[in-house]
């Protein structure tokens, strides 16, 4: 931008020199060449037909005497175009310029534009009396016929057409936290020493028209014209004030039509970065009186008085002009722009006051106006991570609930007075900081009403210096409830102290150019991870402060390491002294409906790989679903496997006790959608495939094919416990033998002594082993298998009870010696608690199974060995029986069938399945005919 300013400066000087040599009757002063292709000016413009260069003049009411102390006053006999005041060189007696600095008319600075105007001034010899009189008449005629709003519109169009295609240079400096987003041009004439000022209340009023008048008091005008750049040599370098919202003055009158033309005619805002080092180093440090009201960090605040007209609004383009300010950080540049808005739109202050500066950048949200000029309304401070704000929050209409508090001397009109209502969100939202997702800046604007007395400044930042961020680790105060003190003084009451985690260099803000995109600010607090950002607010919520008390807590999900407990074998089921867990036990289908079914699919270990491990509720931990900082210490698969002690999901062992009862604890995994996975067995898969097409299908678990998981194949079938709540389960092994004839033949061919089987035999019956077996302290497998059938009811009744699990979780497998009919009846009575409805339901179900078996083609041509009947009922008196475990069920040779109810002899392959089923039906029928349960 500086190079561009130099080029324009050279062109203007050359053009003015040519006109001087040719004797052109133009006034000596600042001129801006009109580029070719520029739109023609309106008939009321100031360009006379004889002129070759364009020149605009400020309104007549803005012409006034300069302060006595200012250099180059209009009484010095020279004309000067004041680049930072409202005079603009419009006096009839001013003849020449007294400075060679580059500037722009003050009224041009109020134009909404995204570029800079460079106006060169030259020292020329005083013209003759006749020429001066002629120029005076021309000026008077032009000032009478030209409307200021037309000048503004056309002049803005020229500036935008001149600079719309120019890309600002990027600063090569490194190590600064800067904006990653494009932003409009900034004012390069602002010195780095200038104290930042808070934003004007009307900066964010987007819904009001520009057409409203804002006549300024003479005091305000004199303040804005009071200073010229005190460093002409630096002004010469092409550092011109920003045209647009950053200009310190504003036009006195402006029509709605002009505002519409200006808004529609403005091109897209060009991108810009930080200025070049040359431009940074050449900034000047004028006094704070340039801006009618500005915030003095260590001394005072020049508060605003009333303006004589309605408060002007802003369109959306005005909110775009946030950019880095030289060596400043983005938030500092942001504040400096707001200081310019404040100086432009507020009146003079009768008396300065002090304000509190307590928070680092991002800790305090910018205060908002509640409808009045020179009034501020504090809001409850947002946390740093609350940087994401819905774009809707920036498009607000005026709130009819605003009220004006008495005692505000700066209030003029019913809605223009300074009402200060803490905690009420006004019509203007934080457009630059909230809308682009950046955190709020570390300033609290104080009340701007005339108030005797002062507030203590708490940061000690001296006047004339930039507002530096607090160093890392410095204790700051989290302001919660701003209190409106008497006389509209704003005091902030600290609530708690926190440690600011890092310097501003490590946490740059995110800026955009009026895109409405929600971006998360990078300001983070170490103690605020659990609080979500206040992003979307309903219209009723927009006038409420966003405080942690209004933030709903995120429900925690209790998860536990499934891998550490899933294998905990169902040994806990068999006689564990622990009582039932205080958790609702659900089946996997119920669990799948809660969204945790995927955890079953990712089980890392088999459920019986370590049967000695127990379920320890103390190992449960609380895992919060943190959206701010996702945990990366554990893999997602591990997390899904840890759902164990959730109130929605019960233990896998509790849901599948029949797995342990049937002796297959190491073969199962849980699956989703009410299914379980059993280790693949070729013979069982073949049987299940055939059963799905057989009449027995209603009495067997539904088979859903085989799947590969963790490198292993599994048969996937229905979870039979899905429809039961706290079920009672019994496993009965059917048949008069539980081993295949092939197993017996193989064991005889290669007999091997098994000490483990001898130990089991001795535990059941110490007198069972023979003298030879006692001497060897070992038995063969065939011997053990045959002995095993004789000690239970298998050999006598055709079935035996493997185990019972009650609804309270207690497990009993001590049925090895349950041999007689009376013992079996007592076991069923204990299992059903004598409930006649359950006994009748079991009996009827067994009868239906028997009728189906008698006509089943599958049953006739298969030797069913090691299969079980699974009895399930619950407290709702639901009772079902299923046929399970077909791993040892083998097909017979072609044309051979079995009767299933004749005694077994080695070689006939009879299994005695129907014999055992008939005995079960008889026992249950006898029990169901007994006296009903009282």
From Swiss-Prot:
GO cellular component terms listed in the entry, alphabetical order: cytoplasm; cytoskeleton; cytosol; endoplasmic reticulum; membrane; nucleus
Pfam assignment, any one: IPK
Entry EC no(s): 2.7.1.127
Enzymatic reactions: 1D-myo-inositol 1,4,5-trisphosphate + ATP = 1D-myo-inositol 1,3,4,5-tetrakisphosphate + ADP + H(+)
Chain intervals for the UniProt region annotation (Disordered): 20-46, 58-109, 161-282, 364-441, 522-549, 568-626
Polar residues biased stretches: 20-35, 210-220, 250-260
Region (Calmodulin-binding): 756-764
In-chain residues carrying the UniProt-annotated modification Phosphoserine: 42, 48, 70, 209, 274
Keyword Cytoplasm attributed: yes
Single GO term (MF): inositol hexakisphosphate kinase activity
Binding site for ATP: 667, 678, 718-720, 731, 805, 885
Main enzyme class: transferase
Binding site for substrate: 733, 754, 781-788, 888
Biased composition (Low complexity): 92-106, 575-600
Function: Catalyzes the phosphorylation of 1D-myo-inositol 1,4,5-trisphosphate (InsP3) into 1D-myo-inositol 1,3,4,5-tetrakisphosphate and participates to the regulation of calcium homeostasis.
Family membership: Belongs to the inositol phosphokinase (IPK) family.
Protein name (Swiss-Prot/TrEMBL): Inositol-trisphosphate 3-kinase B
UniProt source species: Rattus norvegicus
């Amino acid at each position: 931008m500086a190079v561009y300013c130099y080029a324009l400066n050279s062109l203007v000087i050359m053009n003015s020199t040519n006109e001087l040599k040719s004797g052109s009757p133009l006034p000596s002063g600042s001129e801006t060449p009109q580029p070719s292709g520029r739109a023609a000016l309106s008939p009321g413009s100031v360009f006379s037909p004889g002129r070759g260069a364009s020149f605009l003049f400020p309104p007549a009411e803005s012409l006034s005497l300069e302060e006595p102390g200012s250099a180059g006053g209009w009484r010095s006999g020279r004309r000067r175009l004041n680049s930072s005041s409202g005079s603009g060189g419009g006096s009839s007696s001013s003849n020449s310029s007294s400075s060679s600095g580059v500037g722009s008319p003050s009224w041009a600075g109020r134009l909404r534009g995204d570029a800079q105007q460079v106006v060169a001034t030259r020292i020329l010899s005083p013209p003759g009396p006749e020429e001066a009189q002629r120029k005076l008449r021309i000026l008077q005629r032009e000032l009478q016929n030209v409307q200021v709003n037309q000048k503004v519109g056309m002049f803005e169009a020229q500036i935008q057409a001149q600079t719309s295609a120019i890309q600002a240079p990027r600063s090569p400096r490194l190590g600064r936290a800067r904006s990653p987003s494009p932003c409009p041009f900034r004012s390069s004439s602002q010195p780095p020493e200038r104290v930042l000022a808070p934003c004007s209340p009307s900066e964010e009023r987007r819904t009001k028209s520009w057409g409203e008048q804002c006549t300024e008091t003479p005091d305000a005008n004199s303040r804005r014209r009071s200073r010229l750049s005190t460093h002409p040599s630096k002004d010469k370098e092409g550092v011109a004030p920003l045209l647009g919202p950053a200009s310190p003055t504003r036009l006195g009158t402006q029509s709605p039509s002009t505002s519409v033309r200006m808004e529609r005619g403005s091109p897209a805002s060009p991108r810009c970065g930080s200025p070049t080092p040359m431009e940074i180093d050449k900034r000047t440090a004028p006094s704070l009186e340039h801006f009618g009201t500005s915030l003095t960090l260590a001394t005072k605040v020049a508060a605003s008085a009333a303006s004589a007209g309605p408060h002007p609004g802003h369109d959306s383009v005005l909110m775009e002009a946030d950019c880095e300010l030289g060596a400043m950080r983005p938030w500092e540049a942001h504040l400096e722009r707001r200081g310019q808005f404040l100086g432009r739109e507020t009146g003079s202050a009768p008396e300065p006051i002090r304000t509190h500066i307590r928070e680092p950048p991002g800790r305090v949200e910018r205060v908002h106006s509640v409808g009045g000029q020179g009034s501020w309304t504090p809001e409850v401070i947002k946390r740093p991570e609350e940087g994401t704000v819905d774009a809707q929050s920036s498009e607000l209409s005026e709130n009819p609930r605003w009220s004006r508090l008495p005692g505000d001397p700066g209030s003029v009109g019913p809605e223009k007075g300074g009402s200060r209502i803490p905690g009420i969100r006004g019509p203007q939202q934080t457009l630059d900081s909230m809308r682009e997702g950046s955190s709020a800046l570390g300033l609290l604007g104080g009340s701007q009403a005339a108030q005797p007395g002062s507030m203590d400044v708490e940061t000690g930042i001296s006047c004339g210096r930039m507002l530096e961020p607090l160093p890392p680790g410095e204790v700051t105060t989290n302001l919660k409830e701003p209190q409106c003190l008497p006389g509209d003084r704003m005091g902030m009451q600290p609530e708690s102290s926190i440690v600011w985690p890092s310097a501003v260099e490590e946490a740059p803000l995110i800026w955009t150019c009026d895109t409405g995109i929600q971006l998360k600010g990078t300001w983070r607090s170490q103690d605020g991870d659990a609080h979500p950002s206040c992003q979307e607010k309903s219209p009723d919520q927009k006038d409420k402060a966003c405080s942690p008390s209004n933030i709903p807590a995120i429900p925690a999900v209790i998860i536990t390491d499934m891998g550490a407990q899933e294998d905990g074998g169902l040994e806990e089921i068999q006689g564990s002294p622990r009582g039932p867990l205080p958790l609702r036990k659900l089946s996997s289908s119920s669990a799948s409906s809660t969204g945790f079914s995927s955890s079953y699919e990712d089980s890392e270990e088999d459920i019986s790989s370590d049967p000695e491990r127990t379920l320890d509720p103390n190992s449960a931990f609380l895992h919060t679903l943190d959206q701010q900082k996702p945990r990366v210490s554990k893999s997602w698969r591990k997390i899904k496997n840890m759902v164990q002690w959730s109130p929605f999901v019960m233990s896998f062992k509790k849901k599948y006790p029949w797995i342990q009862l049937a002796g297959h604890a190491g073969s199962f995994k849980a699956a989703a959608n009410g299914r379980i996975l059993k280790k693949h067995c070729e013979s069982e898969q073949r049987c299940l495939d055939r059963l799905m097409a057989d009449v027995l299908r209603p009495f067997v678990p539904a088979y859903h094919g085989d799947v590969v998981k963790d490198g292993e194949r599994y048969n996937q079938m229905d979870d039979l416990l899905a429809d039961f709540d706290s079920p009672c389960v019994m496993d009965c092994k059917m048949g008069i033998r539980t081993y295949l004839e092939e197993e017996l033949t193989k064991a005889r061919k290669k007999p091997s002594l098994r000490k483990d089987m001898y130990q089991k035999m001795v535990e059941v019956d110490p007198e069972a082993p023979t003298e030879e077996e006692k001497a060897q302290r070992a038995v063969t497998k065939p011997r053990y298998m045959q002995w095993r059938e004789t000690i239970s009811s298998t050999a006598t009744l055709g079935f035996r009870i493997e185990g019972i699990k009650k609804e309270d979780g207690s497990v009993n497998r001590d049925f090895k010696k349950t041999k007689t009919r009376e013992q079996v009846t007592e076991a069923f009575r204990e299992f059903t608690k004598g409930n006649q409805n359950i006994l009748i339901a079991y009996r009827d179900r067994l009868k239906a199974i028997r009728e189906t078996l008698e006509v089943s083609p599958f049953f006739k041509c298969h030797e069913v060995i090691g299969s079980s009947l699974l009895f399930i009922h619950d407290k709702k008196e639901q009772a079902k029986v299923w046929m399970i475990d077909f791993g040892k069920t083998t097909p017979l040779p072609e044309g051979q069938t079995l009767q299933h109810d004749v005694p077994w002899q080695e070689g006939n392959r009879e299994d005695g399945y129907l014999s055992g089923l008939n005995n079960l039906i008889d026992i249950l029928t006898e029990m169901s005919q007994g006296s009903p349960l009282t």
